[in-house]
């Protein structure tokens, strides 16, 4: 009888032990699932894995090891082979393109030529500035394409996080990932919105992020062999923090195109399109005073609709049409009569930056290399 009671107690103990073990295992699973859903970088990590596989395949090396923060930044890595912009597809700016090739692209493509001494080496910071629509972002993409460097497009929205301390870790991930993928270009468009002048009214998180960015930037500038470059673009160079300007020793003004450059832009835009052979590009360019490269692209897009409209009108009238006619010079001139250029924005840019004592606007036409003058 006693033995039976003892066996019953032992069985009950084993059952309770198994129940507790099952409960603990279930609790761990629930906790693990909950933590996975709380991870702000979970979806970004999945997307980044595909990017890493693609980059590893192009570079011909095994998949790189990255942490969760680098996975988030990897989502903004662009394979240079997938960039459809090159110097040949950018009209005008010939002198600047030549300077960028010598100072930026060549050291990234042929590092062995710049490995002797301290005077030569990859540029660590380059600034492209000028009015809106003049092709700064296109130039940045073309640099990545021509150099074969991976293009890390840094967006401030991706660096901000609701989790304390994550912003600094994401900034650190930008540079650590660039090191692993070098040659690499870290591109910051509208850099004034991220690295503008520091003010007492700035949020503490933004200030800490700027400080972390500059500290890490200083770290790789001391490494002469690192093929990592920060490329920034802005419409407001006078708004940049002076500490940032010191880290961007090579600065290029991408100004409004002149008549010859406007004609070149028109020819590049219309290359490969169905156009009449007798278009006088120089004459059309003379009518486009104050137009940026972006304006000229929109001009051609609007003009391309005229042949389509005429074709549809013919079809509505019951007439047989073989296809839209070629785009003509008259189409371009018709659009010019009603189009709106961004010259106002360009004028605002000139006025704003001429008021800043730190930026001189009087430059020789052949002075393609513009140094940021800080007083």
Q: Model regions: which residues?
A:
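Long, contiguous hydrophobic alpha-helical segments, chiefly transmembrane helices and signal peptides
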Residues: 21-34, 113-114, 194, 240, ...
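Ser/Thr-centered flexible coil motifs
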Residues: 62, 66-68, 258, 328, ...
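Active-site catalytic microenvironments for nucleophilic, acid-base chemistry
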Residues: 37, 146, 302, 306, ...
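Exposed alpha-helical structural elements
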Residues: 54, 68, 72-73, 283, ...
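AAA+ P-loop ATPase mechanoenzymes
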Residues: 1-99, 107, 123, 361
């Amino acid at each position: 009888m006693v033995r039976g009671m003892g066996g019953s107690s032992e069985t009950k103990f084993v059952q309770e032990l198994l129940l507790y073990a099952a409960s603990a295992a279930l609790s761990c699973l629930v906790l693990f699932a909950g933590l996975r859903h709380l991870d702000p970088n979970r979806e970004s990590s999945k997307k980044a894995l595909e990017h890493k596989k693609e980059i590893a395949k192009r570079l011909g090396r095994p998949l790189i090891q990255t942490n969760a923060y680098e996975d988030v930044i990897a989502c903004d890595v662009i394979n240079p082979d997938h960039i459809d912009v090159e110097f040949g597809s950018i009209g005008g700016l010939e002198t600047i393109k030549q300077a960028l090739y010598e100072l930026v692209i060549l050291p990234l493509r042929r590092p062995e030529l710049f490995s002797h001494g301290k005077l030569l080496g990859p540029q660590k910071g380059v600034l492209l500035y000028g009015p809106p629509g003049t092709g700064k972002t296109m130039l940045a993409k073309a640099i990545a394409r021509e150099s074969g460097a991976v293009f890390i497009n840094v967006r401030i929205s991706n660096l901000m996080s609701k989790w304390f301390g994550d912003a600094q870790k994401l900034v650190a991930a930008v540079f650590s990932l660039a090191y692993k993928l070098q040659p690499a270009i870290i591109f910051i468009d509208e850099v004034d919105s991220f690295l503008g002048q520091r003010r007492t009214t700035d949020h503490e998180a933004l200030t800490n992020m700027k400080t972390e960015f500059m500290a890490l930037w200083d770290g790789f500038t001391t490494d002469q062999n690192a093929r990592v470059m920060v490329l920034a673009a802005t419409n407001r160079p006078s708004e940049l923090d002076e500490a940032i300007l010191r880290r961007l020793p090579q600065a290029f003004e991408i100004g409004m195109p002149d008549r010859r450059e406007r004609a070149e832009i028109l020819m590049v835009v219309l290359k490969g399109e169905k156009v009449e052979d007798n278009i006088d590009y120089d004459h059309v360019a003379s009518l486009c005073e104050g137009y940026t490269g972006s304006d000229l692209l929109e001009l051609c897009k609007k003009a391309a609709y005229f042949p389509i409209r005429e074709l549809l009108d013919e079809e509505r009238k019951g007439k047989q049409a073989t296809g839209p006619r070629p785009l003509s010079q008259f189409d371009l001139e018709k659009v010019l009569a009603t189009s709106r250029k961004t010259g106002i924005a360009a004028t605002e840019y000139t006025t704003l930056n001429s008021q800043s004592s730190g930026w001189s606007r009087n430059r020789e036409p052949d002075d393609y290399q513009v140094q940021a003058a800080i007083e």
